[in-house]
Amino acid sequence: MNICFFGVGGVGGYYGTLVTRYCNDTGKGKTYFIARGRHKDAILEKGLLLKKDGGKEEIRVNPFFCSDTVDGLPVMDVVVVAVKGYDLKGATHEINKIVDGNSVILPLLNGADIYERIRQHLKKGYVLPACLYLGTHIESPGVIFQKGGSGQICIGKDPSFPEFYPERLLQLFKKAGILIDFFEDVNIEIWGKYMFIAPFALVTATYGKSIGEVAHDENLSVLVKNIMQEIASIAKALKIGLPSDIAETSFAKASQFPFETKTSFQRDVEVKGRQSEWDLLGGTVIRYAERFNLPANNTKATLDRLLQDVDKR
């Protein structure tokens, strides 16, 4: 099998390391990494190092190929897309060059409308809606650090090809030591996760507060809950079968994080000049609300304030 990891930052690097180790040990596949800058250079020089489970286990691998371009690559059996939301459109155009009708595309991004975003520009292959539970980041060029999360990937059917079952992908990832599960309706998992990350990301970034500070603030906690209700209304309009108490249970998850935890979106926003996934986390909600004529006043006001503050820097 030919497996491309398009983006080998925290997420792509974690799964890319595990799959590469399996392929190198068994000879049952080749991995191709698409990376950039000093990270790419470090991988070419000394391989990619994963510090798994907080550094308890270290795994170093050398992919079959690593470059910042797909030019000259063969058709891929699997493409794992692990870029930031703002790079997705450009990545999709490049991925078009290395897939055919039999390729499986697995997007591992935050967001509730990733499938639709990809299908706007990629008509070939099987695109599997997915979400994941993983806390990783690039510690230094060529080094990935896992700080939390089970690493579970939840995947579902391609709505355009509902009869397709990704047996080869599932077996490959499981043999590589990855926790991956197939769901008949993965949208419940995707929107359930989005229900937590989008409101907390927007509010923590806009007001410069940690997850714990937001959860314990009288006004900001109400704002988070209101945004959650707006997202729940959209999910209902999309006929996604979320539990009736999804907003309450999602908010309660904040207590599972250390009080001082910042969201990754918040950390991106705090770095002047760095791009962020504001459209993925806020713009999506506003567009869906407009489509279904639903209120999204809290989401819009929060996002507007955030973007105004960023523009002033």
Locate predicted features.
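NAD(P)-dependent Rossmann-like dehydrogenase/reductase catalytic/cofactor-binding core
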Residues: 2, 29-30, 174-175, 223-313
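A structural signal for isolated positions on well-ordered beta-strands in alpha/beta enzyme cores
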Residues: 2-4, 32, 106, 154, ...
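Active-site-proximal catalytic alpha-helix in oxidoreductases
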Residues: 187-212, 219-232, 258-259
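Helix-loop-beta segment of a Rossmann-like dinucleotide-binding subdomain
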Residues: 99-102, 144-154, 205-214, 262-270
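NAD(P)+-binding Rossmann beta1-loop-alpha1 motif at the extreme N-terminus of oxidoreductases
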Residues: 1-58
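Rossmann-fold dinucleotide-binding core
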Residues: 74, 110-189, 193
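Rossmann-like NAD(P)(H) cofactor-binding subdomain of soluble oxidoreductases
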Residues: 57-143
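Short, well-ordered alpha-helices that flank and scaffold nucleotide-derived cofactor binding pockets
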Residues: 17, 21-25, 93-97, 120, ...
